[in-house]
Every structure is written in structure tokens, then in C-alpha cells.
């Protein structure tokens, strides 16, 4: 039934820490195991870093086990302690709305059906909300040693700095209680999470033992960083790489992964996709022998975009990538994809704008987009054959766009040479 999911996770490099693996293998072999991972609504969307534990649940489900996905409506109000200081306290209404939005994202990654492996989605506010302070302190707090809690690395670092509120200090107890409640209600016996959650997860293992004399398991997946130690999942503009397409466009998502470094791409393929060993070995060979072709990066970007946004968006962004660099018809692109691509190309800057009724020549456009430093440089670019609009070369420095030149009535794609491209947006449309 399970194949050997532990071997699968091991060769993919997806086990950071665990309780006794032999005991876990035995539990998995005995029949369908129920496991869970939790995701706190600390923003309106999950981000790319959440995918590793979320996909781990999916891998277990494919191997014949039942995942529980927990949206932390209660723990999201408290906040897991960080090294960098207290989290902002968001309102109950805000966290509830974020939990609702995140739940809809979580539902896309696991199979919700009536089979023995059908996933369950829960919110820990359902059992934490009714819990009184007295019951919390007597029934849960009694089983925790303050000395052990103070020994956590994050707690020690915070106490050496500006300190920590009791609110965040108590987060571990709430997460531990989640594990107890899920075991009691669903027979859950494995918690999966990021390696930064190890202390909280082990607290849940211990609380199950202390309260009910029950033995349960824990497994963490690695936190994702690049080979040079940079934090994974930051977009071009420096913000998080969100799963919500309104917060990170499918085009920006695709471009992030297609620009993955050679040193990271095979590891990311192991962690983020379901490609088998043979496919991964071939892509690893391609990266070593033909790095310029970026076959592994393009496959990673396609797999990740399809996973999060669907095949239709993958095809659209691939078409946009080709068309924007002169290898396709820009007029075939839908406006949302075209606009997202041109805004992404602007990075942290603003997309250049033109006002209807105020003629702008190709020289004006090159300067406005920053593709030329001066009007003289722009003229030289045109005279040397290096200027193009919508993939059509422009040879006249006095050329101005007609209404029909604007894609979807709004956009121009201006290029200097083969690799330097920017968008121009016409106001008032």
C-alpha cells in the first residue's frame, strides 16, 4: 500500500529530522496512517516555502495514507516566535479571513474525497476557541517544563535581546494540543512540518505521551534555501512569492523558477515535483552537459506553474516568454498575462506611461522606459537598427505609435537590442 514512502522521502532529501524511523516505517506498513501538517494564516496567502510540507502530505496520500491539513485560525492569532522580534498582532476578523482564503488554497493540493485516504481540512480555532484559561493551564500547561521551553534556541535568542511576550512563549503549548486533539478525533499519529518547527512538534509528541500514554511520530522537511544561502521564495521586487495570483502573477511565478541557479535546480525538482528518478537523472545530466539550454529550469518552472496555477496559465506564460523576446506573436497574449509580464520586467520601477493626444516618438519611448540614457543615445540605437516596438524594428527616429499599435489598446513592448525590453502603458484606456 505505502510502497516505501520513507525511502522516497530519503532519496529526495526531504527528511531533516524525525523520531524513530524504524518505528515510523512499522506504523506506515501496518495500514493507512493519518498524518497532519499545520499552516498558520499570517498573511492573506500561502507562499512558496509552504509547498514543501504541503507536498509532503500529498506524497503520503499518494502512498496510501490520509492527510489532515490544519489551518491555524487560533495559532495564527498568537504567532510562532521568530528570531527577529514580536509578530504584529492582527485582528481576529483579519486572521479569520486569511484562514478562509488559505483553506481554499490548501484544498487544491490534496484529494478531498470519501476514500480511506481522503484528506480532511480542519481549523484549530474549533477546539482552541472554547478552551478556558483555567483548563488550558491545568490540562495542558501542567505538562510543560519552563526550563525546557527556555532552552529553545529561538527563545534564548529573544531573551538575550528585547525579550518575548508570554503570548508567543505559549505558542508551543497550543500547537502541542493540536496534535493531541487530532489524535483523539482522527487517530492522527504523525505530524509533518518544516525543520524550524521541530521543537513545537516534539512538544506535541511528548504531550500525547504525558496526557494519554500514546506514542506518536514526528518528521520534518528541510527549509528551502539556495546554494549560496539566500532565503528561498523572494520575488524580483523583494517580496514573498505568493501562491495567490493576485499577489504574485503566474508570469512572475514562472520567471522565478526559470531563473533558478544550476546549483539549486535539481534539488528543487526533487523537493517540489513528483518526477521520478529517471526523469530527474536525465535533467541532472542535461544541466551538467548543456547548462546553457536550461532544460531543468524550464521543466521546473512549468511543473511549478501547473501545480499552483494550472496548465492554462503555464501555456500562457510560456507563450509570453517567447513572444516578449521576439519568438512569438504578441497579439496572441491575453492582456492579464501581457500586463503582468511587463510589470515584472519593470522590477521595482514603474511601467512607463504615455498620455493619449501627446505624441511620443520611439526616441521618447526609449528614454521614458530607461532603455536609453539620453535622447542622443536613443537616436543612435534607432539608427543602428537596435530599436523595436512589438517585435517590429523601427528605423525612423521620428516614428510614433498609431492607435492600432497598442496591444489590447493599452500596451507597447519596446526593445533595445535582443535582451533589453520594457513596457509602455497608455493612460486613459
UniProtKB/Swiss-Prot annotation:
InterPro entries membership: aa-tRNA-synth_I_CS, aa-tRNA-synth_Ic, Rossmann-like_a/b/a_fold, S4_RNA-bd, S4_RNA-bd_sf, SYY-like_C, Tyr-tRNA-ligase, Tyr-tRNA-ligase_bac-type
Keywords: Aminoacyl-tRNA synthetase, ATP-binding, Cytoplasm, Ligase, Nucleotide-binding, Protein biosynthesis, RNA-binding
Annotated Gene Ontology cellular component terms: cytosol
SMART domains, per database record: S4
Positions of the S4 RNA-binding domain: 360-417
Localization of this protein: Cytoplasm
Binding site for ATP: 234
SUPFAM superfamilies hit by this protein: Alpha-L RNA-binding motif, Nucleotidylyl transferase
A Pfam family the protein falls into: SYY_C-terminal
Locus of motif 'HIGH' region: 41-50
Coiled coil residues, start to end: none
Any GO molecular function: ATP binding
GO biological process: tyrosyl-tRNA aminoacylation
Reaction(s) catalysed (UniProt annotation): tRNA(Tyr) + L-tyrosine + ATP = L-tyrosyl-tRNA(Tyr) + AMP + diphosphate + H(+)
Residues the entry annotates as binding L-tyrosine: 36, 171, 175
Motif ('KMSKS' region): 231-235
Main EC class the enzyme belongs to: ligase
UniProt-listed Enzyme Commission number(s): 6.1.1.1
Function: Catalyzes the attachment of tyrosine to tRNA(Tyr) in a two-step reaction: tyrosine is first activated by ATP to form Tyr-AMP and then transferred to the acceptor end of tRNA(Tyr).
Similarity-based family: Belongs to the class-I aminoacyl-tRNA synthetase family. TyrS type 1 subfamily.
Quaternary organization: Homodimer.
Name of the molecule in the record: Tyrosine--tRNA ligase
Gene: tyrS
